[in-house]
Amino acid sequence: FSIKTSSDSKIINCGNFPYQSIDSGLFYKKINERLAKNKNIEFFENIKEIDKSNSFIFNSVPSVPNNKSNLWQHFHGVEIETKENFFNEKIVNLMDFNCDQKNDVHFFYTLPFNKNRALIETTWLSDLEDQSLMNYDLQLENYIKNNLGIKSYSINFKEKGAIPLFYPSFNNDNKTINIGAAGGMTRLSTGYTFLNIQEHSKYIVKNINRIEKIRMFHLGKKYQFLD
């Protein structure tokens, strides 16, 4: 992968630990197909209220403290396709800091899938109060045309998200297990959550028969210290 600034560019060879990307659509499809084979699982949508009195809940909705200074990783991305070969599919540009920072942390991310198709994201590390940071479409358009030099392209799809870079509020309800970002599975230094979710899921499965009595799953103290 590569890291760029306004004055320098570095390529880091990590052959033993290759960067990997998972197609979320294919991932959800595989999991949903597996879940559908279990007759004791039902899916409900558009439920506004649930009765917690006789239920055990796995909750993925973070309880976010009302703190305007909380740090978020918020991003918008587009998958673009060009008529001519443009990208080096062997190198992901993990962070390009050659862009307006506006006293926060701002970078662009480029993940090539092949020579003429790539995902490009604008990413900010900031609070969510400054609306001037959120003209994402214009940021992407300017970066693609002016920094990458791509004048003609089509957009296959768009994505967006906001990842809390702080630990959510935890309740002591022994009828609820918080999972995902709500369960503190996000690495605060990177925003990465996926692998920690897999480890938490294994922990839940291993202890499912005594789920109400097990200790809360935490990231290793080493990673909490580093974050």
Label the predicted regions.
Residues L165-S169, K202-D227:
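Active-site-proximal substrate-binding core of FAD-dependent oxidoreductases
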Residues F1-A36, N40-F44:
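A conserved beta-strand/loop capping segment in the N-terminal third of enzymes
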Residues N16-F17, D130-M134, S189-T193:
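Short, solvent-exposed loop/turn segments at secondary-structure boundaries
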Residues S9-I11, L125-D127, G183-T186:
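A short, flexible beta-alpha/helix-coil linker loop
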Residues K158-I163, A181:
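Catalytic cores of enzymes that engage adenine nucleotides and/or redox cofactors via long glycine-rich
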Residues T110, K115-R117, D173-S189:
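Short FAD-binding loop at a beta-strand-to-alpha-helix junction that anchors the flavin cofactor
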Residues K30, R34-I155, P164-N172:
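Predominantly flavin-linked oxidoreductase catalytic cores and closely associated redox partners
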Residues L140, I144-K145, T193-I211:
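An active-site-proximal "capping" alpha-helix that borders the catalytic cofactor pocket
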